[in-house]
Amino acid sequence: MQLMDLKKQGIDIQENIPLSRFTFTKTGGPAQYLAFPKNLNELELLVDTVKENNIPLTVIGNASNLIIRDGGISGLVLILTKMDTIVANKDEATVTADAGARIIDTSEAACEAGLSGLEFAAGIPGSVGGAVFMNAGAYGGETEFVIKSVRVLTRTGEFKTYTHDEMEFGYRHSLVQETGDIVVSATFGLEPGDKWAIKAKMEYFNGLRRAKQPLEYPSCGSVFKRPAGHFVGPMIIKAGLQGKRIGGAEDSMKHAGFIVNVGGATATDYLDLIHLIQKTIKKDFGVDLQTEVRTIGKEKD
């Protein structure tokens, strides 16, 4: 079966679609094929078909901490945002969410059920799958602290469940970055708490985010990992790079280390500015800045 034949089976699959429509930076080239599976059956069929036809497969979440190069992505790109069911179980103190569900919505579902532990995620714009993949965190919380289990679809087409310990979480790292497994759902193990206290904590974190982050512009969030013994923002400021602009990409005047699209930016603008910051920080401070943001895709011809 050919990939586009799946359209006849009701699967939402398209050709040559600009990925800038979906990324938080509003940059990125086209996907050769782009599909939005609605359920596990469609996802499994898509994975089987690309395997059968030797087509490259890329999965992206909410594209909030992602740069896609201007040449786009060959093969099939999967966006799982239509797989977004969230189920809270107050008796077991768990929340299970599909990979395409927003982690913000998952945090809110936990709050409504009076379950504490996901408050840190109240302002994280990514998907559950992306949060697991990157071990997303904020305000002292990390995805790994609350993960109970993760269900995946392997690239060989088998469903598998990993325990917390099997996920090999690290700073902005998880096992699935190595295996290429597709996260399909995650179960969070939480603690009973007071709904209003949980809500107040979430609102506090959201207030901090609004005050400190440049939410008025498209961006990919925090670009760099925090190096041991250093803070990225102050180094960028001391190096004179806050406000530095290449094309339409600017290191934010509101929060150094966030690169925003102030108008017409390309992925190349973003990457050139990232490389300039890395080179300058290395020269001035002897520190190698590693990116937290994930970069995928090919250069434009």
For the regions a protein language model found, what residue spans apply to each?
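Short, basic and Ser/Thr-rich N-terminal targeting/leader segments
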Residues: N53, I60-N62, V146, Y217-P218, ...
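An N-terminal domain-start capping segment
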Residues: G129-Y139, K201-F205
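Residues embedded in well-ordered beta-strands within globular domains across many folds
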Residues: V87, E119, R151, V293-R294
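Phosphate/pyrophosphate- and phosphate-bearing ligand-binding catalytic cores of soluble enzymes
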Residues: Q14-E15, L153-H275, K279-T280, D284-D301
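A generic local secondary-structure boundary/capping motif
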Residues: L66, S107-A110, L118-A122, N135-E142, ...
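Structural signature of FAD isoalloxazine-binding scaffolds in flavoprotein oxidoreductases
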Residues: G28-G29, A35-L40, I67-T85, F133-H164, ...
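Anion-binding (especially nucleotide phosphate/pyrophosphate-binding) glycine-rich loop
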Residues: M1-V128
